[in-house]
Every structure is written in structure tokens, then in C-alpha cells.
Amino acid sequence: MEITKQQIIHTDVLIIGGGTAGCYAALTIREKSGAKIVIAEKANIKRSGCLAAGVNAINAYIVKGRKPQDYVDYARKDADEIVRGDLLLTMSEHLNEVTSKMEQLGLVILKDENGDYVARGNRNIKINGENIKPILADAVNQLDNVDVINHLNITDYIVEDNTIKGAFGFHMENGTAYEIRAKKVLCATGGAAGLYKPNNPGFSRHKMWYPPFNTGAGYAMGIDAGAEMTTFEMRFIALRCKDTIAPTGTIAQGVGAKQVNAKGEIYEDKYGITTSQRVYGTTQENLEGRGPCYLRTEGIEKEKDTDLKKAYLNMAPSQTLKWIEQGKDPSEQNVEIEGTEPYIVGGHTASGYWVNTNRETTIHGLYAAGDVAGGCPQKYVTGALVEGELAALDIVEKLKDQTFDITDNKEEQLLDEKVKEYNNILSDKDSIFTIEQMEEAMQKVMDAYAGGISSHYQFNENCLNLAKEKINNLITLSGQLSAQDYHELMFYYELKERLTICLTLIEHLKARKETRWHSFAENLDHPQKSDDWKKYVNTKKVDGKIKVILRELVKEDEHYEHQN
């Protein structure tokens, strides 16, 4: 099998990734301009990205009595200061606006007898959100002058003189190679799962917290193109219901369940209640022989059983099915919890592209929004929507103010070269290893030497140096891999993306000489927190090597612009 068909497309805006941020950016651009848009989506926008299975709450909302600065303060505290104040504030100021827009599109938001949204805690509101992604996708599909290309896997940016010109990719169903030339490009490809050995093995390995098909393509393409990245060392580890990997917040906030150990002792007060502290506390209780750990649901009111079962049907039905299979309701037994493997995801932590206040990266004309954008943790759904909107608004303004020539007399030659690269991988050459075996080897290395589950999320510099050496060996070996069809070709590039991210992640973990976030970055060589490290750890690939850049913190009242 080989790629024989080619297509060159010219457009005003290319959106890579038709998930939460990408779809909302398209809606905003078309509302504010007549720009032509191409959305390149690896799956199908109807059920792709983090919203594919739905959600049961809007976790970032300014409820009555609160203001945007309150949300900024919450996110800053959770990340222990390492956030971009400008990004958090501009996001927080628009959370309610995008929520209202989603309701207008058809999202069901629960209301009380007074017609007010039903709050869940200080920042959340309840929704019936199983169909939230189809709602968003349907709105995009109705837009004029928007070409959605599903099953198109983008593999490389086209960058000249640090300016984005477009991207290359291939279609996984018909094998067409694409070169898409654009005046502006928005990367909205999500975060990176599958770097570490997961909770569940074998056939169930994709039973994980984050979409297993979000493999960090946007990060990897940016790294290889010389974009500056930030705070990869702030990994995200989710505290989840054991085995089902269902959310714990639904129980903790829905019925006020506390974290308890096997002795019934509440331990969350001992370690703290930030996201990383909740994971760390659970890990420590298990290490010190007081596990397993649970959310204490035993004894809750019987009517809460039904509420919890219904809530999980909107996003994690396996948890409801587990209760039914066991023949015991939540009120009759506590829910066991565990930490997941680490992920790189800018929607929960501050890891991702280093962007200016308008979400433009250090590559001119390339924007990042949602999980792929760094500096702005605790985005959740609405934050990703806002970042898509903010990037879109700046794109519209720049398209008005600037003139562009996106044609290139080498277009056909460049696409021919990319097709040769694809077909070289699609060749019939014998390979000692399969792509899946190589992926498992990568995950084992990261798990053992870069702070995975088996090492209780801990690492030291010697281990990280070994991880770097072994990942580089795997990169060399991956050059011998081959793919039998277009689907396997996608797997090849997903592996390539993950290996690229692993190297950058390792450099970030080495660079921060402190432990600011337990479990997220548990550095045994530097177990204490230090004020000397109240700064961003950034990286940039220069001449094939990863260069570490330290930057000072940016506050809410600053409008940050790149100096390059």
C-alpha cells in the first residue's frame, strides 16, 4: 500500500483539531468575519476530543457572588503560583459568556425553581452533557465557508523564517496526502496521553482518564518547528475511581464524600486539598500501609444513590455499571480510588505552548488553544471554549490588518517529498518490532525512570538521565518501523509524537530543582519547595537540542507579547 493521491488547499485559516477549542474558534471566526476555514480532524468532529463521551458539569463557571479574579486565585493556588495571570484572567472573564452560548446551541443546563443554574460547589454548574460534542459539531457543520475534513491526520507544520505557512497530513481512509496552505493556523489538538504505562494493561489499556487518541501531535509538531514550550514538568495525574477511572469530583462534590484510608481515617486534611496533594496523600497512605483508600460514600442518603448513578451515565457509565454488577449502591460501600498515570495536558495544569495574551505562539501566525496551550490551568470545557474564541478574535483582527501571500512555487515539490516520507514508512520492509511493542517499551521506560505509577510518581536525576538515554535509543529503533496501511501509518506518527514529547518532558523534570507539586513533579534530589523557582521553566529545540529557558512570572495586569 502506498499514497498516490495528493491535494493542495489554500485557505485563510487552518484549524488543526476539531475538538472543544477548535470548533468554538470556527464559530467565532465565521461570526466575526468572512474568512475561509479548513478544520483538519483526525477522527470525526461529532465525537472527537475530550468531550467525546460527554460531561456532567461545567467545572469552570463564575457562580453568583463570585468574580473572575476569584477563579484566577483558585487556579493560582492549585498550581502553587506557576501560572500566567494574564491568561487566567482573560479566560475567567469570558467563562459565563461561552456557557450562555452553549445553552443557546442546545446544551441542557440544570436550573432550580427560580430559574437559576444549579451550582455544584463554588465554581461548577450541573448539566446534562452527554451530547455536548454533537451540539458543538452540528453548529460547525452548519457554517458556510468552513470545510471540515474528518480522518485527516496532520503530521508536520510548514514553517519558514519562524512564520507558519500551513501543514502536511494524510487522510486515513482514502490515503490522500494534503498540503494545506493558510494565512493563520490554530493548533487545538489537545494534550498527550499514552506517554506512561497506564493503570489497566492489555486490551483495557485505553480505559484511562484522558482520551488515548490525544497523543500530543500539536506539542510535537511545535517542538520540532522550534516553538517555545512551558511547564511540561507540571504533569497531571488524576485521582479516579479504581478500575473504571471514573471522575471522583462527581462524588466528592456531589455528596460531600471525604477521602479515607482503610482504617476509616480522613486523610485529605493531613496532606492538603489541591489536585496534586489529593493524589500525593493517596499515594502516601498506600505506601505507609494504610490503604486501600476510598471516597466515603457509605451511609449517604439513599436518594443520593440514584443521583450518582444518573450523573455517571453522562460521562462514565462504567462506574454506574460497576455498582449494578456488584449489587451494592454507593450508600452501601465506599468507592476505592487511585491515581492515574501522568499526562501532559494544559487544560488542567500549565503545560503547553508558550503563548502571548492573545494565544499566539512564538511561531508567527500559529495560535494554540485548549489543552495544547500552556500557562493557564483549570480550563476545563469552558476555558477551552474561551481560548478558542480569544485566538479566533485575534486571528480575525490580524487578517484585516495584514496582507498575506501563502502561495509557494515549491508547493508541489514539498508535497512530493512528504509523500516519499509517508511511502517509505508504508513500504514492505521487514521490521523486528511492531509499533505497539515500541509504544509499550516507551511507556515502560517512562514508568520506571521518569516518575510513573510503579515508582510512585517519584524520580531523581540519575533516573531521568537513564530515561533520556533509553528514549533516544527507541527513537533510533523507530526508524526501522513500517506500516501496513494508512491506519498503522497514523500509529507510527502517534509514536513519533510521544517520543518527541518524552524527551522534552524529561528536560523539564530535570530543570526544576525543587518539588513544588507533590506527585506531579516529585523530585527526590530536591524534595523541598524553593522561592528561587517561582518562575517558568520553558524549553525550545535549537539545532536538534532542547534548550532550557527560565522566565519570570506574568501577572494579571500585564499584556504579554513575545520578544522574538
In which residue ranges do the predicted regions lie?
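Core beta-strand elements of the Rossmann-like FAD/NAD(P) dinucleotide-binding domain
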Residues: I8-T11, N174-K184, T362
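Glycine-rich active-site loop/strand segments that organize a redox cofactor
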Residues: N59-M91
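Glycine-rich loop(s) and the adjacent beta-strand/alpha-helix scaffold that form part
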Residues: C187-A246, V381-D394
